[in-house]
């Protein structure tokens, strides 16, 4: 049954809370600033932020539980967060929650659940998964619903400057009536804006490096509407969707009742909590286009500066030969693994056994290997700790391990290399009675790899 429109919902929502942070562990010395692969640059670059850094990782649309693809992304950029902290760099971490969107509304209707309840239930499940995986929470965890009113002046300003336009309504082939007034960003007008004082101006493709034909194909696959009647350019993204019967909507004054488009939401939240360009905009590589590429255009139109200095993306995680996705239903859920008694530290180790930019497939064998690895680490650290104070015992191997782990994670978050170094230390610790430093290794695992023994 269609649900009635809900106007002004944001006034009913409290600010979204994140999850509890894992215990903070400080290591001796200090790491170098990390280098990461910048998708826009097409190479590994030095992240030049020695005073403060900002990180925006696109959040979930909460209509289903956290699957391994989600977990892989948030664990990967948790490693970046930890790399900065170990280098003495404070981090402003922002993450959104798309708690009103078409997939969420469709799932709520299909299951006869109020969309707000569905969003809150799945967001809470996500929080518990992230806490179990020892992911450092964002300083600003922001739902779209709670922040919709911040969008109104942004879109109105784009209108005043001739960068946004309305399209007429129409009836589609299925007989669905689309009313007058949807608002789109005019990409041609945005491209024609003059360069800023630093010489920067935005153009489509600066993040994704795709041809226009490739963009058009992907745009349709990832939530875009290239064939929408009345658009000036097929790639023009939606800014404001005017009210439809049965959908939630918000009274936006001159814009009319409706709800926001996807890309402008992240632009708005990033601008709200970070002064200037983000240090790193991150997410799965399925967000490279259209979300991050066109999102950069939104930021340029709104603020006359680059959205981010760097873009970083994780590879896709699959199961049974296909990308893991909610729509396909081939999901390995973190919550189900936890409910089955699996240690979330082992799940995290299984994820970090793959390089974050690689596409990979989840298997039971990966988890079994990670569980054995975790058992070995716990045993080796315990044995090494038990030797402390004994004659001839030294922590030299642990100190060398700290250097190796820092170097591996500092070079494009190479967690597999870091774990291989811990493996080698564990073998040595179990074979050589002079190897100590167990407490330091415990701290290395907690502080840099997010693994708690």
From Swiss-Prot:
Zn(2+) binds at residues 58, 266, 291. It catalyses: 1D-myo-inositol 2-amino-2-deoxy-alpha-D-glucopyranoside + L-cysteine + ATP = 1D-myo-inositol 2-(L-cysteinylamino)-2-deoxy-alpha-D-glucopyranoside + AMP + diphosphate + H(+). A motif ('HIGH' region) lies at residues 60-70. One of its GO terms (biological process) is cysteinyl-tRNA aminoacylation. Its EC number is 6.3.1.13. GO terms for cellular component: cytosol. Binds 1 zinc ion per subunit. L-cysteinyl-5'-AMP binds at residues 58-61, 73, 96-98, 262, 284-286, 317. Its cofactor is Zn(2+). The keyword Nucleotide-binding applies. Gene3D superfamilies: Anticodon-binding domain of a subclass of class I aminoacyl-tRNA synthetases (1.20.120.640), HUPs (3.40.50.620). Signal peptide: none annotated. The keyword Manganese does not apply. A motif ('ERGGDP' region) lies at residues 221-226. Pfam families: tRNA-synt_1e. HAMAP family: MshC (MF_01697). Monomer. Catalyzes the ATP-dependent condensation of GlcN-Ins and L-cysteine to form L-Cys-GlcN-Ins. This is L-cysteine:1D-myo-inositol 2-amino-2-deoxy-alpha-D-glucopyranoside ligase. The lineage of its organism: Bacteria, Bacillati, Actinomycetota, Actinomycetes, Micrococcales. The gene is mshC.
